[in-house]
């Protein structure tokens, strides 16, 4: 058996390096492909309303396949599941390159992403445990954020040069992720021999949801991570409307740069969490979650660019410190109760449902004519109150 299977293995074992590299390339491809495909839609004169549909089919795949992907991750070696999922992403990107309908190709990438997520996080708990698991999550989040930054920029820059080159670069990134997956040790399946009857799988998934919800620690983690990622996506769209109103800047680049500050901050916060928080001290992350809402409220009142940059980076630092320990807690407790793959699949369902819900509420607020600054203030205040309520509940239970 590979040395990386043992719980006392180095955080930089061959298997862990392969996982981190594969995750970086896969996430790089995801983010570059979004901007490259948006450029393709513009070049082919698709209507503007069609652009958000790309994100909807991507998120929709997570929700639709949530009952099944966790069992897939737990029924096979997770490294091989990751390789198969990246292969689907490669096929989706290549199909767009060769002129297949971009929505169909992007849907295929979404299916691959849905299958990939439970395996990529679940395998961390098989390669390492305990305090090293929090550090491994920090590495995973840091590599993901770096890929988001570089992938987004690369997709946009290459698409301005030539859309086909940008799409080909995405396919190449996915191909590199497939190769990296080959170097992950073939670990034993966590829960082999499960039924593949779709009705039974759906029932099993619902049982996993129920089991995780009834456990105080995993429910705490599920609610916390869902609130965080739902708020993160909403903040991204909030910035697009906030920048011209608050700063008087009407270009397309400034909201992108501000979003980048959040991403950079998350890397810093994830690193701090890996050093300062363990599974036994997860509650240390809760004040950071409350402060996210407070800083968003303060940020909404700004009218200068430099303070906006600084506050958004602070939001990112707080966010990374908040979410990484919660992820690790869910993986460790979920692995023992329903399997790590099922736990992450349930988490994906919660997070993506929260994204759709929060974006829907935000869109409704904009639709009825509420100004963006009051929306930002209310958004920050509600998030701080929600995390405070979650912390109080966690302390009582």
From Swiss-Prot:
The annotated topology with respect to the bilayer is:
Multi-pass membrane protein
| Purpose of the protein | Catalyzes the facilitated diffusion of 2-acyl-glycero-3-phosphoethanolamine (2-acyl-GPE) into the cell.
Q: Name the family the entry cites.
A: Belongs to the major facilitator superfamily. LplT (TC 2.A.1.42) family.
Got any disulfides in this one, which pairs? none
Q: Which InterPro entries match?
A: LysoPLipid__transptr_LplT, MFS, MFS_trans_sf
Membrane-crossing segments per the record: 18-38, 53-73, 91-111, 145-165, 167-187, 227-247, 257-277, 281-301, 305-325, 344-364, 367-387
Q: Name one GO molecular function term.
A: lysophospholipid:sodium symporter activity
Which gene codes for it? lplT
Instruction: Give the Cytoplasmic compartment stretches of this protein.
Output: 39-52, 112-144, 188-226, 278-280, 326-343, 388-397
What protein am I looking at? Lysophospholipid transporter LplT
> Keyword GTP-binding on this protein?
no
A GO-annotated cellular component: plasma membrane
Pfam families, per database record? MFS_1 (PF07690)
User: Which keywords accompany this UniProt record?
Assistant: Cell inner membrane, Cell membrane, Lipid transport, Membrane, Transmembrane, Transmembrane helix, Transport
* Gene3D superfamilies, per the entry: MFS general substrate transporter like domains
Q: Where in the cell is it found?
A: Cell inner membrane
User: Which stretches are Periplasmic in the membrane topology?
Assistant: 1-17, 74-90, 166, 248-256, 302-304, 365-366
């Amino acid at each position: 058996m590979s040395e990386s299977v043992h719980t006392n293995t180095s955080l930089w074992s061959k298997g862990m390096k392969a996982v981190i590299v594969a995750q970086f390339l896969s996430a790089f491809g995801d983010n570059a492909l979004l901007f490259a495909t948006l450029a393709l839609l513009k070049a082919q004169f698709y209507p503007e309303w069609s652009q958000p549909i790309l994100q909807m089919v991507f998120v929709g795949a997570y929700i639709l396949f949530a009952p099944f992907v966790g069992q897939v991750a737990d029924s096979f070696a997770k490294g091989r599941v990751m390789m198969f999922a990246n292969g689907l992403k490669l096929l989706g990107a290549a199909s767009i390159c060769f002129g297949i309908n971009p929505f169909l190709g992007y849907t295929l990438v979404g299916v691959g992403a849905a299958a990939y997520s439970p395996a990529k996080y679940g395998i961390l708990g098989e390669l390492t445990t305990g305090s090293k698991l929090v550090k491994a999550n920090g590495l995973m989040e840091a590599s993901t954020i770096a890929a988001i930054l570089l992938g987004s920029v690369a997709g946009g820059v290459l698409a301005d040069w030539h859309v086909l080159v940008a799409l080909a670069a995405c396919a190449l990134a996915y191909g590199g992720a497939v190769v990296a997956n080959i170097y992950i040790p073939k670990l034993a399946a966590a829960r082999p021999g499960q039924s593949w009857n779709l009705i039974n799988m759906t029932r099993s998934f619902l049982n996993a949801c129920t089991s995780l919800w009834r456990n105080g620690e995993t429910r705490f983690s599920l609610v916390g991570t869902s609130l965080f990622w739902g708020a993160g996506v909403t903040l991204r769209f909030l910035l697009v409307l906030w920048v011209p109103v608050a700063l008087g800047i009407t270009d397309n680049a400034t909201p992108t740069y501000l979003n980048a500050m959040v991403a950079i901050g998350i890397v810093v916060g994830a690193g701090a969490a890996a050093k300062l928080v363990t599974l036994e001290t997860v509650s240390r992350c809760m004040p950071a979650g409350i402060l996210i809402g407070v800083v968003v409220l303060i940020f909404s009142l700004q009218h200068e660019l430099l303070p906006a940059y600084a506050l958004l980076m602070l939001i990112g630092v707080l966010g990374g410190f908040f979410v990484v320990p919660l992820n690790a807690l869910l993986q460790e407790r979920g692995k023992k109760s329903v399997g790590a793959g099922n736990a992450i699949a349930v988490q994906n369902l919660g997070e993506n449902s929260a994204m759709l819900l929060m974006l829907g509420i935000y869109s409704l607020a904009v639709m009825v004519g509420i100004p963006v600054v009051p929306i930002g203030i209310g958004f920050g205040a509600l998030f701080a109150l929600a995390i405070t309520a979650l912390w109080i509940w966690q302390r009582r239970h």
